[in-house]
Amino acid sequence: MTILTHTLGFPRVGLRRELKKAQESYWAGNSTREALLAVGRELRARHWEQQKQAGIDLLPVGDFAWYDHVLTTSLLLGNVPARHQNNDGSVDIDTLFRIGRGRAPTGEPAAAAEMTKWFNTNYHYIVPEFSKGQQFRLTWTQLLEEVDEALALGHKIKPVLLGPVTYLWLGKVKGEPFDRLTLLTDILPVYQHVLAELAKRGVEWVQIDEPALVLELPQAWLDAFKPAYDALAGQVKLLLTTYFEGVTPNLDTIIALPVQGLHVDLIHGKDDVAELHQRLPVDWLLSAGLINGRNVWRADLTEKYAQINAIVGKRALWVASSCSLLHSPIDLSVETRLDTEVKSWFAFALQKCGELALLRDALNSGETAALEEWSAPIQARRHSRRVHNAAVEKRLAAITAQASQRENPYEVRAEAQRARFKLPAWPTTTIGSFPQTTEIRGLRLDFKKGNLDANNYRTGIAEHIKQAIIEQERLGLDVLVHGEAERNDMVEYFGEHLDGFVFTHNGWVQSYGSRCVKPPVVIGDISRPAPITVEWAKYAQSLTDKPVKGMLTGPVTILCWSFPREDVTRETIAKQIALALRDEVADLEAAGIGIIQIDEPALREGLPLRRSDWDAYLEWGVEAFRINAAVAKDETQIHTHMCYCEFNDIMDSIAALDADVITIETSRSDMELLESFEAFDYPNEIGPGVYDIHSPNVPSVEWIEALLKKAAQRIPAQRLWVNPDCGLKTRGWPETRAALANMVKAAHNLRQAK
């Protein structure tokens, strides 16, 4: 039984982000649809060939998406919201873009569908919308066309489909409430049709993704898998594919299904290979997800070999990436600026394909010399001085419970803060960033490229900060910010100033649509060699008598939005960051900054997939925040900002952060999010966002007033702040001025109405 290699998917965007550039050019009306489609064809052909040359035996087809693979599945099934449909009922690429982003070169603009995180990754998918009695039919044949493309190029392929149960699980009901699981019988005929078309083309194996099988699903959803797969059986061999967690808790459901193989994530799950081998039907193929698809680290292939070798020859076996390589950058070879030693520790998507080929060859032959040679750098890393900092490890080990406790409870602190700041009722502020103009971006780029010296760069940044303070004073805001002109990204900026991080030059990964991010990589113990934000905060404060907030990104968010180390726990990384930023809080305070905001937008999205694992995560996540903040004196006010849509299930932890003020995103929910805080009797101060910064629309004074009055019905007015939903980085100055002026006016009106 020869072992084969395959990947669950490959990055779509292209080494130079060609897809992003083609999409944005098309959306702007600067190129034709045909030009966009040609870029897609060229990228697919290139990526198939690259994987093949790297040693992948079965190439994934159907992993490419023009925006998002869940949205592609919606179009495949004919699930197009009425507001996005073409008049003639047809479906084209502009239909897809209207659903994803609200507008396209053709058709009428309409509200985009909701977007949310793909399981516990930093990739986002477009949430399917379901309505009672809706019909499904095969309307978008992208998968079949791409299969034809790959076959014409002579490739051995494995089409990829998002499975029917997971697809329904990921969606939301719109309009009249009903159980969306009842739609299963309606979508299965479309899946049957697609599988029949694939069988006609001579396809042997189809990868059918059901990552919902790693979750703690309600029993009704678990029970739905058997009839669903009974309906899909018989046309091609099905590789039931799971990832991001283990399958053991749901294995009884899985082994009853009429499929021919199972893929398991052996990186992020705790499944035991011997137990899987024992419990799976003897004629099933096992696809072992041994290479991490979500990180940038070179694998220790000697460990992977030992993990799987015991079952070689005992059942059909493939070796694979743990999940799609979508979550990894494409090619390490173009990272010419990385330090040689550090570079030897990494593997990007193409290198991970090579790792699979090395592992396959060793498992088939029993010869392991190549594995030992490949693994030597990652083994040597364990003893590198770049990784271990004895002072950091000693400080972390010495943390006591006292380190995460403020000096006094909120009630005492609030008195000290009121006496210090003497803020009016309904105090107004913003979340942190102001518009990142072309001038600001140009200034940073020129400095980075060496076209501008440090003195001129600092003079330019200082001028933008000064203008931000002048604008805020003109508007009449009560608590000001410096505007973050010096920051490119809220995580990257801190990573650049902390030891223990490195940055790639071209390590882009897709976040959603055309948006790509370049996460920092945590390579070792984290420390702060010098103050990071103090200079600019102190300068901004010198320009005004009003308080200026110091602005920090919190430890859990920095962790969640970086590629983490694999040799220590996430808890260890978060607490190391917290200790480094604790020193920043102390230095800001010593510089006269009386209000310090520690943003934690990722606290909720970092939750483990299984609820039974939540408590442990929340315990150390909250502790990391508190270690970061607790050095502050009573009279220093600690703010935090979070942009979630759901608080109910983590309110205990939100309260346990013990921030003096929390600002949250509420405008789009019409203040309904405050129900969680009201029901919990949240004791500290809250700034419910009063307008949506993602929209260029300027809210009226009356609209903001109405929202604030609604908020005051749930939270005592003396504990309410007035602020936008989020930072204003992506907005232009004209709508920013107009919206903030109306916000300040609404607050003044409410003060006078008292």
Curated annotation (Swiss-Prot):
Main EC class the enzyme belongs to: transferase
Binding residues annotated for 5-methyltetrahydropteroyltri-L-glutamate, in chain numbering: R17, E18, L19, K20, K117, R515, C516, W561, E605
An individual GO BP term: methylation
Keywords: Amino-acid biosynthesis, Metal-binding, Methionine biosynthesis, Methyltransferase, Repeat, Transferase, Zinc
Binding residue positions for Zn(2+): H641, C643, E665, C726
Pathways per UniProt: Amino-acid biosynthesis; L-methionine biosynthesis via de novo pathway; L-methionine from L-homocysteine (MetE route): step 1/1
Catalytic residues, chain numbering: H694 (proton donor)
Molecular function terms, GO-annotated: 5-methyltetrahydropteroyltriglutamate-homocysteine S-methyltransferase activity; zinc ion binding
EC number, as in UniProt: 2.1.1.14
Co-factor binding comment: Binds 1 zinc ion per subunit.
One Pfam family this sequence matches: Meth_synt_1
Record's catalysed reaction(s): 5-methyltetrahydropteroyltri-L-glutamate + L-homocysteine = tetrahydropteroyltri-L-glutamate + L-methionine
NCBIfam families (UniProt xref): met_syn_B12ind, PRK05222.1
Function: Catalyzes the transfer of a methyl group from 5-methyltetrahydrofolate to homocysteine resulting in methionine formation.
Family: Belongs to the vitamin-B12 independent methionine synthase family.
Designated name of the protein: 5-methyltetrahydropteroyltriglutamate--homocysteine methyltransferase
